[in-house]
Amino acid sequence: MKLLNFYCRPTLKKNGSACILVGIRKDIDIKYQYPKPHNKIYNLVDALKKGELFDCDVPKSAGSDYPQHKKDVLDLVPPKGYWRNLPIDIQKEYMGKSFYLGGGKTGIARRIGWDEPSLTLTCSPAQKQTERCHPDETRPFTVREYARIQTFPDTWEFSGSISQQYKQIGNAVPCNLGKEIGFSIIKFLNEYYSKLNSAEPLISSAKAV
């Protein structure tokens, strides 16, 4: 078992962790190796704009909207800002009793910046405690923007209502992370079957891409 930070491979979520459990039989004397850390941190711009990870800007798609009052409040928050960037009277009104409690509460009224990774996505894009507002437009991320942040290919289709699609994406492990875990398992299996004098590796990692 190993705790993997999502920075281990090109993903776009900030400070996310996943408990990855890979079970190996005790009678197998080959050591499984988890994916090695990746030396580059990708930001939101890498997810939503044409560049190294994607060959086009994020496609347009449906998404949630903010109620007018929340939109009016978030209009006042700059990129990479949150509730502390609001005027004090609006802070108190918007935060309610939470204003007087301890803790940073940095997810409230949070607008993501282009030059930072996204915060961990939840199953709902507009929860008050875990706000993820678009950098330029005062709205939640759309379904396809959500999917890009989780490194889903643009061809991946989600089913159900908009809220169900958000939930599917929010519950997912980032695709690139899952792929790297898969490659590490393929490497282990190839070593195992090679040791058993198998003429052919069980799986070709080239075919698994």
Regions found by a protein language model. Give the residues of each.
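C-terminal target-recognition/interaction regions appended to catalytic cores
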Residues: 68-209
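Class I S-adenosyl-L-methionine
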Residues: 1-102, 106-108
